[in-house]
């Protein structure tokens, strides 16, 4: 792999900053391009502190000029004094009832901390809301836990699923082939009592072939401690998940591949080129007519959440031919979005105090 160490000299804008507005902390970026071209940047607003549990809302800022300027912050999910988080947005382009496209935002709610959830003391649920006007307004929430997360309140409660988290980051819709139109949300859950090294966690996913009317569940990734996951449809139609390993044993990203839209898994492996601390990362297929580029974003370190780095593959992740360090300091969660035919947006946690949006041009980086 050929490294390019200097930070990219590209436009950057701070969308959320700790201690400003109504929240002490902002985390968990997710970003989406709406059907008419607007960019939607989602985040968690954490009222008291930066902890995962507490009074947490889901926030949105919109840009109608490709990310040059942004709307004021909008609260789109408020679960009272409890937690709403793990935003996973996706556009449904293929529903004939919504020819202009409809946006889904999947999210989780919880009534106790993750530690207590692992002990079976609370309930995590999965919901979605939708927008028919490119993110300006949103529907009432729909709780789909009965179908996609088998906690104690569901008819499959004997499976004893406890924690749950969508992605976080963008979800996906298949755009071609036998599974065209399938909405797929990578996720993870725990099951049963806590195990050493978080080994009760498994990555999985859930999906719909009828625009959210009914839901199916992918089998678990059979790797103990597999955790937060994000996915993409590869040029050959396969589904790829890129997954966090919660116990941190390998310090590498786990990859899972499916040839049937996530109904089964044909291969899992740890990617030796994708080093990582215990943290979330993102992937995106940057689609072009002649050649699609698989892009990865995440902290490029085995020890600390630091060195936000982009990595590029021209063969669906078999080889990573280029990397570009975007920020050498503190860096954690991120998400990627294709802005137009030439540019990609990176929305990431910078220095543990800001959520920053940065534009880059893959061809320019690959030609350096």
Model-derived segments and spans:
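C-terminal motif of bacterial Sec signal peptides marking the signal peptidase cleavage site
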Residues: 2-3
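Asp-box/BNR beta-propeller blade signature and adjacent active/binding-site loops
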Residues: 6-368
């Amino acid at each position: 792999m050929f490294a390019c160490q200097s930070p990219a000299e590209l436009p950057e804008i701070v969308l959320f900053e700790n201690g400003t507005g109504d929240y002490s902390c902002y985390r968990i970026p997710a970003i989406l391009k709406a059907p008419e071209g607007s960019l939607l940047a989602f985040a968690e607003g954490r009222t008291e502190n930066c902890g995962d549990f507490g009074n947490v809302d889901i926030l949105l800022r919109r840009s109608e000029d490709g990310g040059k300027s942004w709307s004021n912050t909008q609260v789109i999910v408020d679960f009272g004094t409890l937690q709403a988080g793990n935003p996973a947005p996706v556009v449904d382009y293929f529903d004939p009832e919504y020819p202009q496209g409809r946006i889904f935002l999947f999210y989780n709610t919880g009534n106790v901390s993750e530690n207590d959830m692992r002990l079976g003391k609370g309930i995590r649920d999965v919901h979605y809301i939708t927008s028919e006007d490119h993110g300006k307004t949103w529907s009432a929430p729909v709780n789909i836990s009965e179908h996609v997360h088998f906690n104690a309140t569901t008819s499959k409660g004997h499976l004893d699923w406890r924690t749950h988290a969508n992605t976080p980051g963008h979800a996906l819709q298949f755009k071609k082939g036998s599974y065209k139109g399938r909405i797929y949300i990578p996720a993870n859950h725990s099951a049963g009592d806590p195990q050493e090294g978080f080994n009760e966690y498994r990555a999985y996913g859930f999906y719909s072939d009828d625009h959210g009317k009914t839901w199916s569940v992918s089998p678990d990734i059979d790797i103990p401690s597999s955790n937060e996951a994000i996915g993409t449809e590869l040029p050959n139609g396969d589904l790829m998940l890129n997954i966090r390993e919660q116990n941190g044993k390998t310090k590498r990203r786990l990859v899972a591949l499916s040839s049937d839209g996530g109904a089964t898994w044909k291969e899992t492996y740890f990617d030796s080129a994708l080093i990582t601390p215990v943290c979330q990362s993102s992937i995106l297929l940057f689609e072009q007519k002649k050649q699609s580029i698989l892009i990865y974003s995440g902290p490029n370190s085995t020890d600390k959440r630091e060195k936000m780095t982009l990595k590029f593959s021209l063969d669906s992740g078999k080889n990573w031919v280029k990397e570009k360090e975007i920020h050498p300091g503190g860096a954690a969660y991120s998400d990627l979005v294709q802005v137009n035919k030439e540019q990609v947006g990176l929305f990431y946690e910078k220095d543990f105090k800001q959520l920053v949006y940065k534009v880059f041009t893959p061809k320019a980086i690959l030609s350096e």
